[in-house]
Amino acid sequence: MSEYLLLLIGTVLVNNFVLVKFLGLCPFMGVSSKLESAIGMSMATTFVLTLASILSYLVNQYLLLPFDLGYLRTMSFILVIAVVVQFTEMLVQKTSASLHRALGIYLPLITTNCAVLGVALLNINEKHGFIESAIFGFGAAVGFSLVLILFSAMRERLAAADVPTPFKGGAIAMVTAGLMSLAFMGFTGLVK
């Protein structure tokens, strides 16, 4: 039980996919200008990452490995992710049309979010079992969500602040992301 908790904490804080592995930077920078959009994207990405991680494990274990189709791993994982994203988009559109409009193009772009594919591939490379795959996917999603929401809140405050002209927009966002990354480095010794 404790190894599962350590895996979760390690994935969320120590080995954060955005700040340490630099995966998922497109939605991190693109959706983080408004807190409402960031929260919606976080919920959608959490659902997609967790479900895609579990389904990718099942596809690998019960389809690719028994038939010696390891060379189709990346293609099959992309297909699994695309199906999960389409399901999520239909779910969001039916439950919250305003959130669907707010997320706009970023919801279908979860398919191309390298963090989602990265989690699926890292699960296989690190030889995680079913439970570890689910925890790893959920932890990566929670870490992504945590960073996205914190970054979004900071960007909203920076939009109202008196930022020097050369630093407005993307420049101050990159400086802020760098400072967040430094703050998360403080968790480095937490989990081995």
Curated annotation (Swiss-Prot):
Pfam assignment, any one: Rnf-Nqr
Q: Where in the cell is it found?
A: Cell inner membrane
Q: How does it sit in the membrane?
A: Multi-pass membrane protein
The reply on keyword Protein transport is no
Q: Name one GO cellular component term.
A: plasma membrane
One GO-annotated biological process of the protein: electron transport chain
Per UniProt, the enzyme's principal EC class comes to: translocase
Q: What is its EC number?
A: 7.-.-.-
Spans traversing the lipid bilayer: 5-25, 39-59, 65-85, 102-122, 134-154, 171-191
Record keywords: Cell inner membrane, Cell membrane, Electron transport, Membrane, Translocase, Transmembrane, Transmembrane helix, Transport
- Report quaternary structure and partners: The complex is composed of six subunits: RnfA, RnfB, RnfC, RnfD, RnfE and RnfG.
What this protein is reported to do is described as:
Part of a membrane-bound complex that couples electron transfer with translocation of ions across the membrane.
Record family assignment: Belongs to the NqrDE/RnfAE family.
- In Swiss-Prot or TrEMBL terms, this protein is called Ion-translocating oxidoreductase complex subunit A
Q: Which organism is it from?
A: Shewanella pealeana (strain ATCC 700345 / ANG-SQ1)
Question: What gene is this protein translated from?
Answer: rnfA
